[in-house]
Amino acid sequence: MPLNRTLSMSSLPGLEDWEDEFDLENTVLFEVAWEVANKVGGIYTVLQTKAKVTGDEWGDNYYLVGPYTEQGVRTQVELLEAPTPALKKTLDSMNSKGCKVYFGRWLIEGGPLVVLLDVGASAWALERWKGELWDTCNIGVPWYDREANDAVLFGFLTTWFLGEFLAQSEEKPHVVAHFHEWLAGIGLCLCRARRLPVATIFTTHATLLGRYLCAGAVDFYNNLENFNVDKEAGERQIYHRYCMERAAAHCAHVFTTVSQITAIEAQHLLKRKPDIVTPNGLNVKKFSAMHEFQNLHAQSKARIQEFVRGHFYGHLDFNLDKTLYFFIAGRYEFSNKGADVFLEALARLNYLLRVNGSEQTVVALFIMPARTNNFNVETLKGQAVRKQLWDTANTVKEKFGRKLYESLLVGSLPDMNKMLDKEDFTMMKRAIFATQRQSFPPVCTHNMLDDSSDPILTTIRRIGLFNSSADRVKVIFHPEFLSSTSPLLPVDYEEFVRGCHLGVFPSYYEPWGYTPAECTVMGIPSISTNLSGFGCFMEEHIADPSAYGIYILDRRFRSLDDSCSQLTSFLYSFCQQSRRQRIIQRNRTERLSDLLDWKYLGRYYMSARHMALSKAFPEHFTYEPSEADAAQGYRYPRPASVPPSPSLSRHSSPHQSEDEEDPRNGPLEEDSERYDEDEEAAKDRRNIRAPEWPRRASCTSSTSGSKRNSVDTATSSSLSTPSEPLSPTSSLGEERN
């Protein structure tokens, strides 16, 4: 399968061009994951956003392999005929032997080609394949674990497909198979057991045991080296899943994780040190003018304000122009995602705002899907009352405007006492009476199935945040994914994030953390932790993260109570900022989006694939890593301009007010010469230092005789992680409460 294609990687703004060229002739990449065209969790986002940059590199020699789901195919995939003879013969052969294999194009940016394997249609072979798995790998799978049984079927079908593809190819290609997570890991183990000529990569985005242990309130990071992993997995009835994950990690030619914190975790729980850290990125959309994303923030905030007006009808005794919107979103893991810390910090923030007489109000929204049976009637009523008031106001306005127009048309000033009649006053009084409410605005927008034991609602009852008039912090729990068709809050997630002021993600277990990354590329400040992959990555690349709107909460070395106090300090400092300071901060945050662009982070995946090829085909490819100290990263320095770090923000002029305007639109009071947005942006761009990639390791193909350059493994880990990572055996502070 010849393919004459090379890739010249363009650089980020401020970075030198990365001039390595990869000769991809007769090389094919298959990326295997359960979440191909099948949205389940964060891996779907990784594959979806990375597809374009990978497709630009590999062209039509890049395929994604995933499970067939009727819903996914109906809404996301265009079914096509196989484009090559080898692939067509492979599909025909498998379909003729009792399998159902589909081929098409995933309708996302980049339009990658996908091979979808119908797991359910192959259930007839499950018992035979489970027996073969036991004979080959000594891994037994219980009958009651449907997810694990699906993983067995998917793994055998994937191996069958790869073996058939190699057999049907006239020119034997160099195949790279990249497997994501334990659900796809069986296929990797079988490829090695059957000695298929395939270069294999296994990426774990979060270890199974790590997620289970952290959910159980274990002092995880202080005891990594002390866990009896077999015992812990057995007690949680996931030993067979753990064996699948560990076997895949050990069988792979190259083992990668998404962050250094997960690399340390994998080294202790899976007993193999990752070869490369491959951070997760996003497709960054750059705006032609800085004010564009600021305008989007204002528009989205207006949508959220409409929802708040309805939700708090009858108790709307706070100024919406002086209201900040904080949010937390993600999988409903109360402790792992840090919802417990956030709620406690909100209670303390409420106390600080009240005793200091602050006019600022905070609305904290929890977007975490939970079990519900319907919308809360009181919440629906609030939105209905808001719409009724709006319609009443418009009706009166139209009548008033028509009478005013007719009066002016005849050349006389109107008699204001006759502009509104009794019917109008009656209508307005009825609208006012409709806003009367005896109870507090509801905390939860839905009826929960387990209201009495729900962790968020239980904690809210304990800390007493009931949305009373005296509270400066209001709480809204929205236990459902956001949708633009919702009758309550009709916005999608991206629009919602743009309308908020601060994302709060104080996670205890977060191998990467897409939610704060999404905030960053949209110019929204966020709070992360030094136990999340994203937090560690930004801490490594930015000298003073908080100055750029990335607050890093210390959950490594502090107790739970101290972490709550630090988070409270962050939140209170943010509340003290002026509108002008928040605008400047959002500008700085948005400029960090270059760090998270797949155009840059995709290089780590290139390096992993190159290493795998050299290990699987040493006679054709060589990978020569340079000395680890030859690679140097770069760091954004702390901005020198006013205002300084938001946590230490002070007024930049003696006459600061909330009415200050955007600093990009003209002079700003007396200190306008001290801050210029264009100059600030240029300075930040210059602050990006080009990574001094080591001398390129050669990757030589005997068929083409051309050099295949590669990036050193050490570079990948040194740029995405601290050069001297914290040893898991060292003390991480007080025990977690």
From Swiss-Prot:
Q: Where does UDP bind?
A: K39, R331, T515
Task: Supply the SUPFAM superfamilies for this chain.
Answer: UDP-Glycosyltransferase/glycogen phosphorylase (SSF53756)
Tree of life domain: Eukaryota
Q: Where is the organism placed in the taxonomic lineage, from the top? A: Eukaryota, Metazoa, Chordata, Craniata, Vertebrata
- Annotated region Disordered: where? 634-737
Question: Binding of alpha-D-glucose 6-phosphate: at which residues?
Answer: H291, E292, Q294, H297, K301, H501, R582, R586
Q: Where does UDP-alpha-D-glucose bind?
A: H205, R211, R331, E510, W512, G513
Question: What gene does the UniProt entry assign to this protein?
Answer: GYS1
According to its UniProt record, which protein family does this protein belong to? Belongs to the glycosyltransferase 3 family.
Task: Report the function annotation for this chain.
Answer: Glycogen synthase participates in the glycogen biosynthetic process along with glycogenin and glycogen branching enzyme. Extends the primer composed of a few glucose units formed by glycogenin by adding new glucose units to it. In this context, glycogen synthase transfers the glycosyl residue from UDP-Glc to the non-reducing end of alpha-1,4-glucan.
Positions with biased composition (Low complexity):
715-737
- Which molecular function terms from Gene Ontology are attached? alpha-1,4-glucan glucosyltransferase (UDP-glucose donor) activity
Give start-end of the signal peptide.
none
Look up and give the organism this protein is from.
Macaca mulatta
Residue ranges with Polar residues bias: 698-714
Annotated protein name in UniProt: Glycogen [starch] synthase, muscle
